[in-house]
Design a protein with these regions (language model features):
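Acyl-donor (CoA/ACP) binding surface of acyl/acetyltransferases
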Residues: 1-114
Length: 114
């Protein structure tokens, strides 16, 4: 895997009236699944978003069929807000996504990631 990305994570900040809100997105190569990497990264970036960027809301929209991604969000305190029916197309197939979010009022800081 030398020289290749193993995953990615980021926040896309909203603009104008949504400037204190951000969308969280992430991916991890299959060889690294099941090691807690994504959960640790989501916790760390969520903390950074609320504490350093002064966000009031962070949301994510994983595929409804992605139980592992949904579990990561739930372990990090995100709450399911709704189903986005037929909202994405992956490999030519129209699929549903789910909306998960966490607000600054519900955020519970955790210990720094070692």
């Amino acid at each position: 895997m030398r020289g290749e990305a193993t995953g990615g994570i980021g926040l896309e900040l909203g603009g104008d009236i949504e400037r204190r809100s951000a969308e969280l997105g992430y991916w991890l190569g299959e060889a690294f699944w099941g090691k807690g990497i994504t959960t640790a990264a989501v916790r760390a970036l969520t903390g950074y978003g609320f504490e350093a960027l002064n966000l009031t809301r962070i949301f994510a929209v994983p595929f409804a069929s992605s139980s592992a991604s949904i579990r990561v969000l739930e372990k990090c305190g995100y709450i399911r807000e709704g189903l986005m029916r037929r909202s994405a197309v992956k490999e030519g197939v129209v699929i549903d996504q789910v909306l998960y979010a966490l607000t600054d009022e519900d955020f519970v800081p955790t210990s720094p990631v070692a």
